[in-house]
Amino acid sequence: QMCIRDRGVTLVRGVPLDDAELVALGKQLKAACGSGGTVKDGVIEVQGDHVERVMQLLQAQGHKVKRAGG
């Protein structure tokens, strides 16, 4: 199950994808949010408060998502 939270950076953890797929998903999310970010240690980071947008995008792709920490 993926968890998303925000503290100036939107973090997506627990994505059941390999590294290459994770990087591709990170690029999709960053482009959709018009923001920078990175993928490291299995966590997608998108700069800024994009929790709602990221959740919608992931749910539209069939992922189970929950918001963590607020």
Residue ranges and their predicted role:
Residues 8:
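Gly-rich Lys/Arg/Thr-decorated short loops/hinges at beta-loop-alpha junctions or inter-strand turns
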Residues 41, 48-70:
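Short, Lys/Arg-rich amphipathic alpha-helical interaction segments
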Residues 2-4:
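Short, small-residue-biased leader/transition segments that mark boundaries at the very start
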Residues 11, 16-45, 52:
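Charged, surface-exposed interaction regions in soluble eukaryotic proteins
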